[in-house]
Amino acid sequence: IIFSKHAQCRMDCRKIDESEVKEILKNGTINHKKIQNDKRGKTYPVEGFTHDKQHVRIVFAPKDDGLVVVTVIDLDTEWKCDCK
């Protein structure tokens, strides 16, 4: 798993760690309505609850032999973030 700089920033301000991202990848559900496809490829939003009960959406993008975490969203709480 490769974490984009944006995803790392969002994870930091939303209190979501790598283990929770892996947990959602393993146990979450793809939100088919939010799959996007552009010139960079497809992104897959996977939603679920972390072990500490955060309701999150993690956006993944397949890339070569890896999987990129594009962004991390808390679906219940609006966190103050200053990510560029």
Annotate the PLM regions.
Residues 1-84:
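Ribonuclease/tRNase effector modules and their secretory precursors
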